[in-house]
C-alpha cells in the first residue's frame, strides 16, 4: 500500500558536500534530489515496479544562511570567536576528526605535518569557510510525496540535520510490514505477530563504497550495454529512471 523512505545525510556530511563542497550550488551542479537522492528514488521505484502518476515536493534552504550565523562568526572558522561551540566547524571536522580528507591533495602521513597542511587548505579553499557565509543554495531539508499506479503511495525525506546516516525504509503491505536500513530488515506478520529478520553485512561487496554499490552497479550496467551494443545489460532504462 505504501512506502516511507528516509535519506539521513548527517549534519557534517551535508556541511562538507552541500554547503562548502563541490555540490554547494544547485544552479552550478545539480539539485540535492539528484545529487544525493537519485539512488533513493530508484529504490522506491524498483520496490513498487509501477509508474509514478503524481508527485508533490517541498524543500528549502532554511538554516545554512547568513541570518542564522551566531554572534562572533567570521568568514572562516579559523578566525571565528565561537568556533569551538560550532558542530560545523571546519577545524573540528577536518583537523580534529580527520573527516573527508580525500579532498586535500598530497597530505603527509605524519599526523602533525598533516594537520599543518590541512590548516593551509582551510585558509585558501571553501572547506575553511563559515557554513553560514558560503555560496551555497542547496535545500537543507526536502520531502517528496508520490502516487503510483493502483493508488500506491510513497514518501521520501532527504534531511541534512541528522546524527547518523544510512537509508531507512518502511514498507507497509496488507498482511505485513517490513522495516529496514542498510543492514537489517524485519518483516512482521500482522496475523501471527511472527517476525522474520534478515541481517546481512554487504559492506565488503565490490563497489560498496560508492553509495552502497549504487554508483558501481549503474556504471557496470552502462559500460556492458555500450560495449556489447545490447540493452539487456541495463537493470533500468532511462524512461523508468
Give names to the regions the model predicted.
Residues 1-129, 222:
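Predominantly a Rossmann-like dinucleotide-binding segment in NAD(P)-dependent oxidoreductases
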Residues 36, 136-139:
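A generic fold-level signal
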Residues 133:
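A surface/extracellular/periplasmic glyco- and lipid-processing/surface-interacting theme
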Residues 138-241:
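C-terminal helical cap and adjacent loop that interface with cofactors, partners, or active-site loops
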Amino acid at each position: 500500500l505504501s512506502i516511507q523512505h528516509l535519506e539521513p545525510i548527517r549534519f557534517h556530511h551535508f556541511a562538507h558536500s552541500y554547503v562548502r563542497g563541490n555540490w554547494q550550488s544547485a544552479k552550478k551542479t545539480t539539485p540535492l534530489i539528484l545529487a544525493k537522492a537519485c539512488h533513493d528514488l530508484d529504490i522506491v521505484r524498483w520496490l513498487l515496479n509501477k509508474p509514478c502518476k503524481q508527485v508533490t515536493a517541498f524543500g528549502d534552504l532554511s538554516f545554512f544562511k547568513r541570518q542564522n550565523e551566531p554572534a562572533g562568526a567570521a568568514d572562516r572558522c579559523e578566525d571565528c570567536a565561537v568556533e569551538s561551540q560550532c558542530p560545523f566547524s571546519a577545524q573540528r571536522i577536518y583537523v580534529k576528526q580527520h573527516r573527508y580528507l580525500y579532498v586535500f591533495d598530497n597530505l603527509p602521513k605524519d599526523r602533525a605535518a598533516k594537520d599543518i597542511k590541512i590548516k593551509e587548505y582551510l585558509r585558501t579553499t571553501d572547506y575553511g569557510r563559515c557554513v553560514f557565509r558560503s555560496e551555497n543554495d542547496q535545500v537543507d531539508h526536502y520531502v517528496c510525496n508520490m502516487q503510483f499506479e493502483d493508488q500506491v503511495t510513497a514518501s521520501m525525506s532527504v534531511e541534512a540535520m541528522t546524527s547518523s546516516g544510512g537509508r531507512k525504509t518502511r514498507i507497509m503491505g496488507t498482511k505485513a510490514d517490513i522495516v529496514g536500513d542498510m543492514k537489517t530488515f524485519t518483516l512482521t506478520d500482522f496475523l501471527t505477530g511472527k517476525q522474520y529478520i534478515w541481517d546481512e553485512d554487504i559492506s565488503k561487496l565490490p563497489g560498496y563504497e560508492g553509495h552502497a554499490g549504487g554508483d558501481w552497479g549503474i556504471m557496470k550496467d552502462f559500460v556492458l550495454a555500450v560495449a556489447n551494443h545490447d540493452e539487456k545489460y541495463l537493470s533500468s532504462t532511462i524512461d523508468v529512471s
